[in-house]
């Protein structure tokens, strides 16, 4: 992307391939060329599939008006493009599978369940749970090789956290933080839970009451309860503890409007307002 941008937004495909070729020390020329072509084609296919570039036989052209200034901004751009994918595209499966993961987290009451299952078991689960396509192929929809790629994608856009080798903790804290920063929600004012949760559902549709979440829940036989999901509850608590937001806990006879998922070690279990800390959020 940066190479194409540096060339004015359009570059000859042959020239881009030269820029993208890595060094392969110790390999034969034939092996090096094979690796080069494979990696270049993978990069072009991924960028093209997301709508970042348009390719022809001879040229590659940027399909976005401008590039983000840093990797965090690029992750935000990729997340927005994934949300915009057509239902039947393979890239749409990335967030659809994450919605299934959110539902499975509710069913298992465990945010580390990905670490407890093999890639084959996870692939089988997602293949059964993803939204059916109009035309299915003979290939498994989600397989073990795609699982490794999926894990990298969701971590890149802020939906997953590797806390130790072979240990994965599903977490939406980073993505929620970024989404709040980019939002036009009022700062330093009380927001009622219904308004906050409606914003979450429309902005991050793989979470509570979002379209992807509700569709996945229906396919997987999960009936959402009255409490906020474990993933969203954990993210809200994290941001509250970091001072990015303030969850206003009900006092005395005040009405409890939103209940967080059960957590023995948590200090806050319910709230009746959310306040975004403008100075911390927009810093």
Language-model-detected regions and their locations in the chain:
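Donor-sugar nucleotide-binding helix/loop cap in glycosyltransferases
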Residues: 1-283
């Amino acid at each position: 992307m940066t190479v194409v941008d540096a060339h004015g937004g359009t570059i000859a495909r042959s020239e881009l391939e030269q820029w993208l070729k890595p060094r392969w020390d110790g390999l034969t020329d034939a092996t090096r060329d094979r690796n080069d072509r494979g990696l270049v084609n993978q990069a072009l296919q991924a960028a093209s599939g997301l709508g970042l570039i348009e390719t022809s036989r001879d040229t590659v052209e940027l399909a976005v008006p401008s590039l983000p200034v840093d990797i965090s901004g690029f992750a935000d751009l990729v997340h927005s493009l994934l949300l915009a994918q057509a239902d039947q595209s393979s890239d749409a499966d990335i967030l659809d599978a994450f919605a299934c993961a959110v539902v499975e987290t509710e069913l298992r009451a465990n945010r580390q369940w990905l670490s407890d299952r093999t890639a084959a078991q996870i692939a089988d689960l997602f293949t059964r749970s993803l939204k059916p396509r109009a035309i299915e192929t003979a290939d498994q929809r989600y397989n073990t090789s795609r699982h490794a790629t999926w894990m990298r994608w969701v971590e890149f856009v802020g939906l997953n956290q590797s806390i130790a080798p072979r240990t994965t903790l599903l977490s939406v804290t980073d993505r929620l933080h970024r989404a709040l920063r980019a939002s036009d929600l009022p700062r330093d004012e009380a927001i009622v839970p219904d308004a906050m949760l409606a914003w979450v559902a429309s902005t991050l549709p793989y979470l509570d009451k979002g379209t992807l979440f509700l569709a996945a829940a229906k396919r997987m036989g999960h009936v959402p309860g009255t409490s906020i999901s474990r993933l969203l509850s954990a993210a809200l608590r994290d941001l509250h503890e970091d001072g990015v937001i303030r969850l206003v806990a009900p006092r005395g006879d005040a009405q409890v409007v939103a209940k967080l998922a059960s957590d023995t070690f948590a200090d806050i279990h319910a709230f009746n307002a959310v306040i975004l800390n403008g100075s911390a959020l927009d810093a």
